[in-house]
Amino acid sequence: MRRDIALFSGQWADLPLGDVLDKAKGWGYDGLELASWGLHLDLERAVSEAGYRDEVRNAFAERGMTINAISNHLVGQAVSDRYIDERHARVLPPAIWGDGEADGVRQRAAECMKTAARVAALLEAPVVSGFTGSPIWHMIAGWPPITPEDVDGGYELFAEQWSPIIDVFDEEGVKFALEVHPSEIAFDYWTTKRTLDVMDWREGFGINFDPGHLFWQQIDLVGYIQEFGSRIYHCHGKEAALSLNGRNGIISGLLEFGDLKRGWDFASIGHGDVSWDRLIRALNAVGYSGAISVEWDDAHIGREDAVREAVQLLRSYSVERTGGAFQEVFK
């Protein structure tokens, strides 16, 4: 069976859903990773209004397209972040932000993540992708000094916050895929392992594998896939490109994307330093059969050009695993 190539609709949420579906189908995509913001999916309406759900389903069915995943990245960030501030206010729905009081924001965000699981089940989407936030990301520099107890406490708090959410995912038969990403509880190899450990490797909690966030950290992408393949539930299609010229630093965190003083930047597929041929082989080898969801995060290429090229390149790599079939002619 041919692997689905999906378009992540988050960077297209300014356009009506039907328009994005028409564009995506015309470019050769099989479906969408459907963003739960902008003009694409209202979770509260979807969980309570059968007619609204039918509208969403029909929009896909009429075009022969699939809901490969539902994204709730923006809200998920607020569940575990230690500090809730104006950054969250810019991206959270008003109903989640409310009066901005931190505990209330976290509680409403947690309930919204549960709603996302219920909506995914109703719309027959197998995965909800998203962020989690982190109680300890603000300690990343290690100064002022931190202790092992500080870090342990952060992971324990994370498990307390997310276990009840994943209970609902389990009840609904839907997987949650954390996009491993700086600012989240898992951002590299070792923090991925620790996060899965603290969540007891429960099946409802897994990974959205995005090489663009790992490559610039010098993580072995194929090794990462081999280690965590059983918990890779979703995959983003993008790259990163390094520009370490003796002046540009690897952190680059306070520079806008696209600034030439950055030591790395996101790149569209085919325009960075990631070998998607090798990644597809590795994903096939660990049995990943889900979609690759193309995400436009490139400050140097327009979104239509980027995603049109990406699906063509991925299609040339995204063949099903052959196993040992090529040897059958010799038997």
Regions found by a protein language model. Name each.
Residues 1-15:
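Boundary/entry segment of secreted carbohydrate-active catalytic domains
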Residues 35-57, 136-139:
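Glycine-rich, proline-tolerant flexible connector loops at the mouths of alpha/beta enzymes
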Residues 20-38, 124:
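Catalytic domains of carbohydrate-active enzymes, especially glycoside hydrolases
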Residues 4, 31, 70, 146-273, ...:
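Acidic/histidine-rich catalytic cores of soluble enzymes
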Residues 14, 19, 23, 62, ...:
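Active-site acidic/histidine proton-transfer and metal-coordination neighborhood
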Residues 24, 32, 60, 70, ...:
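Conserved, mostly hydrophobic/aromatic
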Residues 299-331:
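Aromatic-rich peripheral "rim/lid" segments of glycoside hydrolase catalytic domains that contact
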Residues 8-12, 35-39, 72-75, 133-135, ...:
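Active-site beta-loop-alpha junctions enriched in small/polar residues
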